[in-house]
Amino acid sequence: MITREEETELVRHIEDLPFKPFDFHGHLANRQVVGFGRRYEYDRREVVEAAPIPDFLLPLRDKVAIFAERFAAEFAQVLVNEYRPGAGIGWHRDKPQFELVAGVSLLAPCNFRLRRRNGGAWDRETIEVEPRSAYLMAGPARNEWEHSIPPVNRHRYSVTFRTLRSNL
């Protein structure tokens, strides 16, 4: 998706962002986040305005849009996640207000786990997401499967881009 040089430049800017621990109804997660464009307000259960997407993220959004075969402006939400060693994210499905979810991994790989209920059991898949690579969740991968990232061994960032669902 991007070159090492582009990754280095992105990380240089990302390191200066005002990260805060992810707050889920008062529970502080072990990863840190900063969001732009739009953000999901958990207490109000709605998408609200956030700070504008910084200029340094716009070229990456353009590349993600080409990858997803969408217009760049459709990716109205950007969430930058910082995972220090030992940090991960539990099983979840992104909020229904968002449609497509695309992510770009920076600095270190991670195991991106997927699961969906199949009767009384779970179908499971694991994808190793390499640094500088991208993934796209759409259709069943977005709407039927949950995903998680187990605790990482090395410091990494992910930049997640989301489109808004038009029928909500």
Task: Give the role of each language-model region.
Residues 1-168:
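Non-heme Fe(II) oxygenase metal-center motifs and adjacent flexible, charged/small-residue loops
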